[in-house]
């Protein structure tokens, strides 16, 4: 998804007003990034570890973003299971390796639509500065490649 409006629309389909306060706070953080960032990228991945971490790494590597980043991460898991602390640390490490100076706000929640062994990640990256994309050599201001 390229534009902020497309990202907002997608987030509207993922969050409902009936969700608990923890999730609502995370949605407000997504909105904060969308309102203040010069450019944004939304990444969604779903699956079991360690494949999920590899997918996240591949998605992040393809972005070629600048250095000043804010990241909002929502990790979801099936209500009948629980999230492993080691798995959560692995996912946050992938993000940190991608951008060591990144500001990360994260939260966890349940999603009954997931398989019991799967996680889903909803990650929004916002950059406060415009830059030249290393891949396409174009000036990027509204969206990331």
Question: Where are each of the predicted segments found?
Answer:
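Tubulin/FtsZ superfamily GTPase core signature
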Residues: 1-145
């Amino acid at each position: 998804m390229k534009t902020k409006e497309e990202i907002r629309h997608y987030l509207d389909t993922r969050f409902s007003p009936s969700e608990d306060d923890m999730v609502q706070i995370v949605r407000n953080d997504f909105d904060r990034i969308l309102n203040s960032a010069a450019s944004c990228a939304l990444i969604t991945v779903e699956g079991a570890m360690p494949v999920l971490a590899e997918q996240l790494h591949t998605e992040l590597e393809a972005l070629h973003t600048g250095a000043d980043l804010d990241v909002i991460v929502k990790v979801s898991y099936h209500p009948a299971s629980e999230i492993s602390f080691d798995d959560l640390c692995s996912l946050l490490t992938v993000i940190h390796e991608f951008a060591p100076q990144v500001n990360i706000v994260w939260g966890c929640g349940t999603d009954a639509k997931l398989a019991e062994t799967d996680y889903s990640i909803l990650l929004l990256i916002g950059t406060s500065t415009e830059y030249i994309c290393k891949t396409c050599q174009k000036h990027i201001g509204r969206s990331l490649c």
